[in-house]
Structure formats: structure tokens, C-alpha cells
UniProtKB/Swiss-Prot annotation:
Pfam families for this protein: Trm112p (PF03966)
Family: Belongs to the UPF0434 family.
NCBIfam families given in the database record: PRK11827.1
Cellular-component GO terms for this entry: cytosol
Xref: InterPro entries: Trm112-like
Organism: Escherichia coli O81 (strain ED1a)
Protein name: UPF0434 protein YcaR
């Protein structure tokens, strides 16, 4: 995942900043508590593909 991409893309739900979780290979929106998957290194920024973060994940 190219970190320069994170400077360009935004959450498709709230237009907020996104964070990369290397361990889970996900792009995270902390404002909406959503995790977007990476497929073959490409972020899938579709709300229908996102999962809701657990309470523990939201805290970190």
C-alpha cells in the first residue's frame, strides 16, 4: 500500500482522513468507525464493502 495514496483519498462516507492498518490490510475511517478492505493492494472504498469496527478497535 502506497502511503502517498492516503494523502489523496478520503472516506467515501464523511470525506474524513483515512488510516492504514497494515496488520489487517484495511483502510480505517476513525470518524465513522469503518474499515475498508484492500484487494490486491487496492483500497475498496465502497460503503457496502466496509465493516464496522468493534468497540475495542475503535479505541486504538
Amino acid at each position: 500500500m502506497d502511503h502517498r495514496l492516503l494523502e489523496i483519498i478520503a472516506c467515501p462516507v464523511c470525506n474524513g482522513k483515512l488510516w492504514y492498518n497494515q496488520e489487517k490490510q484495511e483502510i480505517i475511517c476513525k470518524l465513522d468507525n469503518l474499515a475498508f478492505p484492500l484487494r490486491d493492494g487496492i483500497p475498496v472504498l465502497l460503503e457496502t464493502e466496509a465493516r464496522v469496527l468493534t468497540a475495542d478497535e475503535s479505541k486504538s
